[in-house]
From Swiss-Prot:
This is Aluminum-activated malate transporter 9. The gene is ALMT9. Disruption phenotype: No visible phenotype. It comes from Arabidopsis thaliana. The chain crosses the membrane at residues 88-108, 117-137, 144-164, 170-190, 194-214, 227-247. It is found in: Vacuole membrane. One of its GO terms (biological process) is malate transport.
Amino acid sequence: MAAKQGSFRHGILEKRERLLSNNGFSDFRFTDIESNDLLENENCGRRTRLCCCCSCGNLSEKISGVYDDAKDVARKAWEMGVSDPRKIVFSAKIGLALTIVALLIFYQEPNPDLSRYSVWAILTVVVVFEFTIGATLSKGFNRALGTLSAGGLALGMAELSTLFGDWEEIFCTLSIFCIGFLATFMKLYPSMKAYEYGFRVFLLTYCYILISGFRTGQFIEVAISRFLLIALGAGVSLGVNMFIYPIWAGEDLHNLVVKNFMNVATSLEGCVNGYLRCLEYERIPSKILTYQASEDPVYKGYRSAVESTSQEESLMSFAIWEPPHGPYKSFNYPWKNYVKLSGALKHCAFTVMALHGCILSEIQAPEERRQVFRQELQRVGVEGAKLLRELGEKVKKMEKLGPVDLLFEVHLAAEELQHKIDKKSYLLVNSECWEIGNRATKESEPQELLSLEDSDPPENHAPPIYAFKSLSEAVLEIPPSWGEKNHREALNHRPTFSKQVSWPARLVLPPHLETTNGASPLVETTKTYESASALSLATFASLLIEFVARLQNVVDAFKELSQKANFKEPEIVTTGTDVEFSGERVGLGQKIRRCFGM
């Protein structure tokens, strides 16, 4: 039956005819068996060639991807080795220690019977050998103490178990439970945190000796052989680590504190310079908002100082194990004072973090108001960073402070900023909303009260309105024609900045509604936001002054460290009429005045 022209079936048949005319490249099955076989053979051949090509292409892409990944890993490994060559040396040292222990075991020295327990020597080298000598000594002591105490306790329990006869296995099992419970509970005590590894070794050794000795009946032999092999591995590890390119935890702690001083100084300068340049982030990085590592130099500087607490505590706990070495020539060296000094520095770094928060804030002060305090803000930032860098150099050189007061210049800069704030404080607040300034002894119009400024007030008149205000408000010249119209014009002619936009520029409120005093909501809200943006400048300035106040704690902590660590006296260099104390310059006249207490 012929299909009706224009129907769906008619369209399908036409499509089939076109495909048949194109040598049968169709997915339809035909009734001609020979033609079907021919078409299927051709299609299979093409599909096979296509699959082979695709497989080869995918394989080459995978090989290329593996090669690129391997090359990237090799590049990163090379960069890591170049950045800190000590890592390469440490890797070579641990390989050498393992080789020495293996040779001793192969040649069955010093005792041929110990070869069957040789795995304990290898495990000791792998576990005890640490990056720094202090960490190696700490772990070696913990392992030795845990092994000795566990061995003695296991031997005692083994002797007691023989008294229980058939209940010997039950007694050993109960003793393992009790010892495991007590040791685990004790290592959770805060003061026992430093011996956590020793408790683990204690449990492992106790269980191993008790179970192995129970099977073989040789408790004493197992305990002695284990102790000797652990001593062998620990001795080889300590010897290789101490006598071949030693890496000291105390030196790392010393360098870390110096680095923190430089980083905080860099962040402080970056905050002040960025704020005065009206630096604006087009988009605040999400890593900064979530307090993660970021490449922002200002953020990276103070964050590294704040986040170094755990590293400092770890290095200090290892440094106290190290013997006198290098410039640290005394026993009981005051490593804790390094951490204390760094803690005082972190107290200042928190203020720098708050300064950076002012730059990231959405409420920003206009540029013209920042420029009013530019010189004073700049000087405080420069002097504060200079002080931190100088203290960092003193720590690095291990020198005491000279006779010059390091805080003099930065305190002077902070006082100048404080005086400028007191003088220009009307720029930091909305003075029209001051309650104390709006009080009058008798009711009168605001215009009449302001007009008293130009004439001498008679005795029966109220004093001028600014007599109730602060000294800063009194120096503000308020024009007698100031009113709603002038305030609107001032808002309309506010300059815009391409670097950073202050918060009031974002207002979009309808100005047609009137309030009870005749001012529109737009003007009232604009005044509110303008006052908030000005207060952001006051916040930044007050944080700088707070930073200067906290520097006293840093200087005091450094003086305490320099006394306990017996830092050397600063070198005195005389040049003409000036006397220089290891980088500090003091005029001769100033030195004479200080000698006489002037």
